[in-house]
């Protein structure tokens, strides 16, 4: 089983359960770009180029914060993937995510321009961000939150932010 139980929760070897790990910076950036429908420019490369397609030397604020391999030595082929305080602060209140979430022609903007109901919009955001439909409880809470928000846009943007900063999005499991 991938989840712990009372007999294996303290095990740190023998593969008795799966240890979630965060996505690599390039993978996470590409996932965020896909979910928000907003691409990052990478120097002279055409718009739509993914982070995984770029060479290591291409500047990227996000990849610098979330860790990427600089491959200066063979021993450093893999970047550090342990979350740190700087990453957490950027997830919680960084402008990077907010700009992508509220971008013109981004996912939320496209949902607002479509004829999708709140229920359909919630389902679409869940499928985009964490690859599953919301549970009935999650659907009800999200729907109530959107209805109570100052506007539909604010409610959907907040929901997308919550999904992008969730463990289910950030960790591979």
Each model region followed by its residue ranges:
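An acidic, gly/pro-interrupted, aromatic-rich
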Residues: 1-135, 168-173
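Globin-like tetrapyrrole-binding proteins
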Residues: 159
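Extended, non-catalytic substrate-recognition/exosite surfaces adjacent to catalytic cores, especially
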Residues: 153
């Amino acid at each position: 089983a991938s989840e712990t139980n009372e007999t294996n929760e303290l095990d740190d070897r023998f593969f008795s359960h799966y240890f979630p790990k965060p996505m690599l910076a390039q993978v996470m950036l590409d996932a965020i770009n896909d979910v928000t429908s907003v691409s990052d420019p990478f120097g002279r490369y055409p718009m739509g180029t993914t982070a995984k397609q770029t060479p290591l030397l291409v500047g990227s604020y996000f990849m610098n914060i979330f860790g990427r391999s600089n491959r200066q030595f063979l021993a450093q082929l893999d970047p550090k993937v342990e979350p740190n305080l700087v990453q957490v602060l950027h997830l919680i209140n960084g402008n990077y995510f907010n700009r992508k979430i509220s971008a013109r022609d981004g996912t939320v903007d496209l949902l607002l321009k479509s004829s999708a109901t709140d229920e359909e919009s919630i389902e679409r955001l869940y499928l985009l961000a964490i690859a599953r439909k919301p549970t009935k409880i999650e659907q009800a809470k999200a729907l109530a939150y959107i209805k109570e928000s100052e506007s539909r846009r604010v409610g959907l943007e907040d929901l997308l932010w919550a999904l992008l900063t969730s463990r289910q999005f950030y960790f591979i499991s």
